[in-house]
Amino acid sequence: MNEELLNEIPLLEDKAVFEIESASSLQDLEKVRLSYLGRKGVIKAYFDDLRKVEDTEKKRDLGAIINVLRNKLDQLIMNKESILKAEEVNFKLQNEAIDITLPVRPEKIGRAHPLSKVMNEVKLIFAHMGFRAVNGPDIEDEFHVFDALNTPSHHPAREEQDTFYLKNKINDKRMMLRTHTSSMQIRAMKKAKTFPIKIVAAGRVYRNDFDATHTPMFHQMEGLYVNENVNMGQLKFTIHHFLNKFFGDKELKIRFRNSFFPFTEPSAEVDISYKESKWIEVLGCGIVHPNVFQNVGIDHTKYSGFAFGIGIERLAMLKYQISDLRNFYDNKISWLSHYGFHFSSLR
């Protein structure tokens, strides 16, 4: 083995150096490394054969020669690896570079829902008029939704086909999803210690109806003003001011029609001139019924008040020419992109 090994090593070294220098990728270089320095490589085989040499001095000399070869190949492979990695980085920099002169891809930014826009507009208008916003629960009892509002037990609104009742009672009270936000007005009047009361109550309401102009859930804002000597003239001024501000038309034609609501007397429905050819209802209002004051512990001989209820969806449909109420809840991105608003518009 001694003579054979001494003759093979120079040839093996030349062959290994050539293969290392010829490697064009890190994968090729790894194959060369394994063939020479791996567990089953040539150098490992030389060391295995070295065990068979009995002469200690020769074994030491041959081992030194093999070690020199191993270290040389290891160093060459490390140098080549550094070169290949640098070339790989340069290739990526040249071929995957970002051209900073190119325009950026447009970022998809969400849009504010038209109902959010209208709700904010309405709240802001009434805030400037001195109305304070209040909140209340979506699940209410019959007293706050019907009884306190002078709605008799035989009224159609109390039937199950119109109202979503819950199966379980709380404190022997029948519970339901509120059909209007007037229930928040009742709560505000019951808590009131000082006057005037000047509030708007906005939120979701629920009725068992679904078509192009009705949905089982929709949004409503109701206003209430209670003080001494409140009259219909003050109510009309408030409604006129609100509608003119909301639609941005000081010449907007508005009319009040006699109507009936169990919680107001007198009552009126308010219409605006639509497309100069017909009138369309936008809200209901009236002077608070004395029975309502009596139900919440307010002296109706001293105090009076007015109330109004506004459908947020109805206002949005009129202002932005939306024909189908159900579109508000379809969650279609294309529709929201068309009818939505930039968030900066939500003042």
From Swiss-Prot:
Q: What Enzyme Commission number(s) does the record list for this chain?
A: 6.1.1.20
* Chain positions recorded as Mg(2+) binding sites: E265
Which GO BP terms sit in this record? Answer: phenylalanyl-tRNA aminoacylation
* GO cellular component: a single term: cytoplasm
Entries under PROSITE patterns matching the protein: AA_TRNA_LIGASE_II
- Catalytic activity, reaction form: tRNA(Phe) + L-phenylalanine + ATP = L-phenylalanyl-tRNA(Phe) + AMP + diphosphate + H(+)
Q: Tell me the enzyme class.
A: ligase
- Give the primary localization class: cytoplasm
User: NCBIfam families from the xrefs?
Assistant: pheS
Similarity comment: Belongs to the class-II aminoacyl-tRNA synthetase family. Phe-tRNA synthetase alpha subunit type 1 subfamily.
Instruction: Supply the name of the protein.
Output: Phenylalanine--tRNA ligase alpha subunit
From which organism does this entry originate?
A: Wolbachia sp. subsp. Brugia malayi (strain TRS)
Traced from the root, the source organism's taxonomic lineage reads: Bacteria, Pseudomonadati, Pseudomonadota, Alphaproteobacteria, Rickettsiales
